[in-house]
Amino acid sequence: MSRIGLKTIEVPDSVTVTKDGDNITVKGPKGELTRYFDPKITFEQKDGEINFSRSSESDKALHGTERANLASMIEGVVNGYKKTLKLIGVGYRAQAQGNKVTLNVGYSHPVVLTAPEGVTVKATSATDVEVEGVSKQDVGQFAAEIRAVRPPEPYKGKGIRYVDEYVRRKEGKTGK
């Protein structure tokens, strides 16, 4: 039994959920999201709540997945999503200009990344970068792309990491 799929989703008054063919659109105060919704899963919207059902037992995994995806879409258009990254290292700097972020992280050249549509990026300080948007997928993906430029290394801890990330430290070689 899909326990997640059986939970109802509370829909705030400021949000509208519409299904058009195989696509589902969620509109809210922060923006609008559209994504594919599997036709094997049906949903019923009434009294500000959405209930999900599936056509067969073999669609159990889809049931919970589609419910979780729709819940994150509603959360995104109401509150939005934000990830904060920290650059740790001597001379590591970040600058944001429009939808581009320029990272100076120890390479011979600056690394320039362009944020996808619907995602805003800003450098709150020289070593902090905030990625915000309504789509949980897009925000997480772009934050992961920034982190992948220079992932934290376990010996000195230098690199780009999420603010809440713990980097396990290792001891270096012991001399003779």
Swiss-Prot record:
Alphabetical list of InterPro entries matching this protein: Ribosomal_uL6-like, Ribosomal_uL6-like_a/b-dom_sf, Ribosomal_uL6_a/b-dom, Ribosomal_uL6_bac-type, Ribosomal_uL6_CS
SUPFAM superfamilies cross-referenced by the UniProt entry: Ribosomal protein L6
One Pfam family named in its UniProt record: Ribosomal_L6
Organism superkingdom: Bacteria
Gene3D superfamilies: Ribosomal protein L6, alpha-beta domain (3.90.930.12)
GO biological process, alphabetically ordered: cytoplasmic translation
Keyword NAD found: no
Gene Ontology MF term list: rRNA binding; structural constituent of ribosome
Keyword RNA-binding among UniProt keywords: yes
Gene Ontology CC annotation, any one: cytosolic large ribosomal subunit
Keyword field: Ribonucleoprotein, Ribosomal protein, RNA-binding, rRNA-binding
Similarity-based family: Belongs to the universal ribosomal protein uL6 family.
Purpose: This protein binds to the 23S rRNA, and is important in its secondary structure. It is located near the subunit interface in the base of the L7/L12 stalk, and near the tRNA binding site of the peptidyltransferase center.
Subunit architecture: Part of the 50S ribosomal subunit.
Protein known as: Large ribosomal subunit protein uL6
Species in which this protein is naturally found: Lactobacillus helveticus (strain DPC 4571)
